[in-house]
Amino acid sequence: MSRSSKRARQGKTKILISWGLLAIYALLAVFLLFLIFKYNMLAFRYLNIVVTVLIVALAILCFFLIRSKKVQNLTLILLLLGVLINGTSLFAVGQFIGFTSRLNATSNYSNYSMSVAVLADSPIDNISQVTSVMGPTGTDKDNIQQLMNDLKASQNKELTVEESSSYLAAYKSLLAGDTKAIILNSVFENIIESEYPDYASKIKKIYTKELTKTVETPKDVKGDSFNVYISGIDTYGPISSVSRSDVNIIMTVNRETKKILLTTTPRDSYVPIADGGNNQKDKLTHAGIYGVDASIHTLENLYGIDLNYYARLNFTSFLKLIDLLGGVDVYNDQEFTAHTNGKFYPVGNVHLDSEQALGFVRERYSLADGDRDRGRNQQKVIVAILQKLTSTEALKNYDSIIKGLQDSIQTNMPLETMMNLVNAQLESGGTYKINSQDLKGTGRMDLPSYAMPESSLYMMEISDSSLESVKAAINDVMEGK
């Protein structure tokens, strides 16, 4: 074979390879651009348009270079680079979408369980040995009925339910020997534990039914303002678990005026509890035991606003977030030693790592104003986190932050909305002005609790003037004042 024939054959081979690479490049480009525009990525300073033009321009250039049969080596190099860049970008975008999807994955439901329990030393070890149970059918009728229906369907077992005023009262009756078996709703267990820290070792569960509660879809945002409910639950483990909410902060955001207002409603605020609370008055933290919807509706009713989205994190995720941000800096206006971790917090600017931050936001017994001071400390840490999250450096590391939190934070904010916020921040630059406020009231020990009717609990009776002031401040930010 002559040298010219070899060159001709090599040239044809290169052209075929180039056409193949161009097809792969085009396919990757179509998927990449589809995702970029579907999820509104890079939509600041026309960067998404610039990326599109560059991708299309390279495809057109390579097409004509292949047709011309010239500079074949250069064409191959350009196509290989293009395929590599598109493939890597598509993988990164896919990973990012996967991470954010997992943030939303459990946002439409919450998990809890209903059980039949007996004393740990009871000879009863199977549901077939039980004929009657005690439980609060007056306050948790629907969940108890679901358990009874499941027992009938799966075990062909019908039980007589003796009425108790609460799960705590049922547990006390079990300890006293007045009943042999009780019903337990997992979301009420930490209420029992607050009075009987060793209760878990005193009982054994002989039957459990896992249940799921559906959460409402997000409310549409109109204009530049919206509200986010930030809930901190008082448990470790899966974020989808139903639990009391010890942190209740409404973040009011106005993108036009670049203002953020953080409103803390103390956990002990005495308010009508929506949904499962039947609009009966109780401390706000107990709304969380009926699901995140109950907390949202309770606060919406209290302040007369819509909460468009929610972000729910447990103390496990709180630790992760602080670690991912490299700690936070806050000003501490009173020295104290935390009961939870024994750490000392001096007056002045302090840098908090994850464990120190957790102690800082959980402490209330060593603070002059108790739970209200704790709420203010929570606001300080939230502000510090927001300032870091809205910094350019944090936005560059957005994917790693989301990856680290994907299993410990729950939000119903769609990816498109998240990207709109990121794009708006990158487009306009600057920083948000963050202010905070907290609802005030008077502490009392004589107010009845719907969830714990036998207990004498600390409640905060809300000040009417403080409530009106808080409402006005939220509306001012919403209206751009």
Protein language model annotation of sequence segments:
Residues M1-K12:
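Terminal targeting segments of Actinobacterial cell-envelope proteins
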Residues Q10-L21, F64-L79:
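N-terminal Sec-pathway targeting helices
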Residues I15-F64:
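Membrane-embedded alpha-helical segments of integral membrane proteins
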Residues L28-F31, L61-F64, I85-A92, L439-G441:
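Residue-level signal for alpha-helical transmembrane segments in multi-pass membrane proteins
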Residues V71-G94:
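Internal/C-terminal transmembrane anchor helices
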Residues T88-T106:
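Hydrophobic alpha-helical transmembrane segments in integral membrane proteins
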Residues L103-S110, V118-A120, N126, T131-K481:
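Non-catalytic, solvent-exposed segments at the cell envelope interface
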